[in-house]
Amino acid sequence: MSVNDLIKEGVSLFKSNNFDQAIAKFNQALDEIEDKNSQLEEQNNIQSWLGRCYLEQALKVRDITEAKGLFAQAIEHHQEQLKLAKQLTNEQTSIQKQNNAQHWLGRCYLEQALKVRDITEAKGLFAQAIERHQEQLKLAKQLTNEQTSIQKQINAQYWLGRCYSSQGIRIKNSSQAKDSSQNEVNDLFKGANGYFLHSLKLLSQFDDEQERYRIENIICYHLRNIFFLRSKWNLYFDKKKQEIRETLFSNKDKGKVLNKKLEGSISTILAVLNIPPIELGLTPLAHYASSSVCNKLFGVVNEDDSSPMRIGSSSYMNDPSEGEGLLELLSLQDLELENKVDCSSHNAFFACFSSRVNDLNQFRLYGKEDGVEASGCCLVFNKNGDWLKVPDISAPFRSFLKNLDENSAEFKETDISNVEYEKLPLYQVAYIAYKDEYIAEEKCEIWLDNFKFGICLKSVDKNSEWHKYRIKKLKEALQQLIKFFKRKANVNDENKNALEYIRYLFKDFAFRDEEEFRVLKMAEIGSEEIEYCKTTKSIYLPYADISNVVDEVILGTNYEKTHIRYKAEVFQHQMKQKCPNVKISRSSLPIYANPPIKKD
């Protein structure tokens, strides 16, 4: 097999995440080149892919010592790549290959800076990353092909912006940071803002329209985050709302344009309740499950019985009025006086999380096995602020959008199965209260419709200023919705259907203590993405393999007090072998085991 064929096989293995096999294949290709003074471009290519393999492995590893070793190997290969690039005889090819090597060296230092715990060590790594990307920028300017030069300059400017913004966030969130660091943080955010704006300016000169649009969205997302970090709430919120509005409503048929006021209110509510990574910050979230489900999620006890986390149907949630609260607020309840009604073509599916970690009530309700309260598990996400990915705002609604707009090329049926579930956006649930003599006014931040209805929404990540801004925007949008639907002419199927975007983001006030967040997905009944569970006799959507993203599993107080007789040390032992980076702990919340097994 030729060197190039071996490289192709290695690339294929890399793209399928088989990094160890890819490394072996690339090393085999390297061994095929006996004269190391020949085939320099092939050697350069091999070193680049080897570096990327080790970088990907370093990103997936939780143990910092192991990660550092992998980063070191990645850097070694990219340095060799740079050395080989400088030996190439064609000047422009040499510059382009050097540019590529500097890019990946910068990425290695940046990702390592984000991993290490010590802030001083992180600053040193950020400095090296910035140095590499500045070299990348210099090389990009030397390329004679104008479009290639512009593209490479945009890339370098973008990653310089990422280096500055990431360093600012890291210092801001660091427990080692002092009050005097605020000026340093502000300077870093200003620097990031400058690089992102420079890259946008260059982007206007780029000819590839489709690629220009893609890059613009990415840069604008990070620019928007800078607005948030600098407490520029109006700019941040307006950009966030604009993206949602353009994503969900710009592809509709000209003959089916949604009322602008309704469109604006829905976009505002989505912008308030959507919680991207920058807003979630370091807030840990919990998912409670039975011990049997926990075993399946991590593939322990019975490896053949492993399963990804599921997104469950709204039909089987604990709230029988799921999705009805907002309709009642807007006086849009269906009376259902007919002898039969048509079944809905779509349904909402969600995976639920709570900001109440190791919480007694949550353990009693959702963390139980065999009917025994607090015998299940609490899975903790986002302790390090690295759980959420950049969300795809359209992902939850693609099948729904297809149904609303059959002529939209962006949402063809073939696209629906390609949704990356891990990029589904996270939403905070708001709670609707119905005013009575027992609900104090201070229990709700918002009161509507002459104090008939109240809205309860907790602050996220202890950012009181941003929370006040969100409350203001949510109140305005709900008032507009109430006013809109009071006009009988506006009460029609098209306008009511538009509420599908938001009605599952509200729950009854009785569930307020759950402090729920949810990942939401609308799915068409009968579509291939929906799966059936014989055990629970219910339908669901597969969500994601969460074994590499859970930070901690807290075993309930009564974990060992069920008929199944699970043992905590057995679970700990098997998790240490299977998922060594997940912390295992025991809850000591004061609760007796209810039947079938009582207190010893």
Residue map of PLM features:
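Alpha-helical segment of the N-proximal tetratricopeptide repeat
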Residues: S2-A24
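Conserved alpha-helical positions within TPR/SEL1-like repeat arrays
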Residues: I7-K15, E42-E56, K97-E111, K152-I169, ...
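Flexible helix-coil transition and linker loops at the boundaries of alpha-helical arrays
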Residues: L30-N44, Q81-N99, Q136-Q153, L200-R212
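Short coil/turn linking the two alpha-helices of tandem helical-hairpin repeats
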Residues: N37, E56-T65, T89, G106, ...
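Partner-binding and oligomerization surfaces adjacent to conserved cores of proteins
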Residues: K201, C220-D600
